Amino acid sequence: MYVQKQFWQDLKSGKFASMVSDSAKGEILKTPSEVFNVMKPMFMENDDVESIYGIFLNSKNRVKAIEKLASGSISSSMVYPREIIKRILALKCNAMILVHNHPSGCPEPSKADFEITVRMAIALDSIGSTLHDHIIIGDSYYSFEASGWMEETRKKASAIIAL
């Protein structure tokens, strides 16, 4: 019982967040469920506020870094494409996966979630990078890619950039 309680306290404290981030480097996350399993512990430290993470990928889609991009309130957080572009360029990444949590436990995307996904897809396309997915984590997860929405968004982003 003590081991389980200690593990839970360590998980809630964020102790494992850096371990998760470090151990994911060089790995390929092939499915939204793999992203969910890797990222769920990252949200345990502050599970009562919305936080946004970026999984930055190299040209072979291997994880270069996992970084917290923003934290907000119980129902929202704000991330600026400009700041993410700066990180993509600094890390010399070709793509990324955007991941955030919904403290309510319901992973269904909000209007703001759709809007930031479009803005990020356009911003990344404009510098020759790709937003592979945007995953929302709650009790389960929602993947914009698995829903089919991401492919259409990338097409629209490319069309806008081509103008």
List PLM regions with ranges.
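Mobile, glycine- and charge-enriched loop segments
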Residues: 27, 35-77
